[in-house]
Design a protein with these regions (language model features):
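Extracellular glycan-modifying ectodomains
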Residues: 1-314
Length: 314
């Protein structure tokens, strides 16, 4: 049963794997653009990296917004950071630092006003640097660098549990009105073998279950993984690579999610807003026709009524 009740004014942060992107983008289509923030650090997959970046938003964190040791330079002379995904690239270390600091500040402002935090784990396999100033650090992304630079390992379950318990305790202290919702990505890690993929998902499920039990209504779990693997349970609902869920499967999960998390107010708001936005995207064959002018008048009236009821549609 959900402890989350999303309203038209709710502000939601999504962080984690590609599945967080998919669900986040669908929610963003239902709400004004400034009320949904999706993967501000880029796509993240493992619970170590996700916790590391979220910890920078705690009130007493002393490593804001990134570790200076995490910068590195590609052969192409571009600069990246091991705690951020590949979309953050700059021609100099200083330029990248400025970019990351600005993005972090925007996210920090959002976190302080957020109502819910969605976290999607994907795997407990992590990659740690073998050498350099950031040696032994778990990277958020390998940035297509040679695998000889990394040590692959399975994150220790007891350590994960202790770290996430400490983090959630601090997060609840700093943001007591927020809800935290975990999900598990249904992506299948064939590169580890299907047996190890199953074990990895099981360990993450046990971690999430332990956290949900310890934190009561503050932390909950939405069963996207089970919906696809147990309810749909058919390769028809996977993409052509047989690893990613298909658009049809994601749409089905989204329908279940709206039932689970949406209040009646948000359901009505999203339905009315979607209809108006769809009409606004209409491209007429003859813009000067009487029929189109009448259509525009009806659209203007729809927008007026919507904004009188709900506020700005943007």
């Amino acid at each position: 049963e959900s402890s989350l009740q999303l309203l038209p004014q709710s502000r939601v942060l999504f962080i984690g794997s590609c599945f967080a992107d998919h669900v986040g983008q669908r929610l963003a289509a239902c709400l004004p653009s400034n009320q949904v923030c999706i993967n501000p650090h880029g796509t993240l997959y493992n619970p170590v990296s996700i916790r590391n970046v979220l910890a920078t938003y705690l009130a007493d964190d002393v490593v804001k917004p990134f570790s200076e040791a995490g910068f590195f330079q590609l052969d192409s002379d571009e600069w990246r950071h091991w705690d951020y995904a590949t979309k953050y690239t700059a021609s100099s270390r200083a330029a990248l630092a400025t970019m990351l600091r600005e993005e972090w500040q925007l996210t920090a402002d959002f976190v302080r006003r957020a109502d819910a935090l969605f976290i999607t784990f994907s795997t407990d396999h992590v990659y740690c640097l073998r050498e350099g100033e950031y040696r032994d650090a778990c990277v958020a992304n390998c940035h297509k660098q040679p695998m000889r630079l990394f040590r692959e390992e399975v994150a220790d379950w007891n350590t994960l549990c202790a770290q996430w318990t400490a983090f959630l305790s601090a997060y609840h202290r700093d943001y007591p009105k927020q809800k935290v919702i975990f999900t598990l990505s249904p992506y299948r890690y064939a590169k580890y073998g299907m047996h190890e993929n199953a074990l990895s998902k099981s360990r993450l499920l046990l971690l999430i279950d332990s956290l949900c039990r310890d934190f009561g209504s503050f932390v909950s779990y939405f069963p996207a993984y089970e919906i696809i693997t147990d309810e749909l349970r058919d390769y028809r609902f996977y993409a052509s690579d047989m690893l990613h869920p298909s658009e049809q499967a994601i749409d089905y999960v989204w329908e279940q999610f709206t039932t689970w998390a949406f209040t009646p107010q948000l359901t009505a708001y999203a339905r009315e807003r979607s209809a108006i936005l769809r009409d606004m995207q209409h491209r007429p064959i003859n813009p000067n026709s009487e029929a189109h002018q009448q259509f525009l008048q009806r659209l203007t009236e729809k927008k007026r009524k919507f904004e009188a009821k709900w506020g700005s549609i943007d």
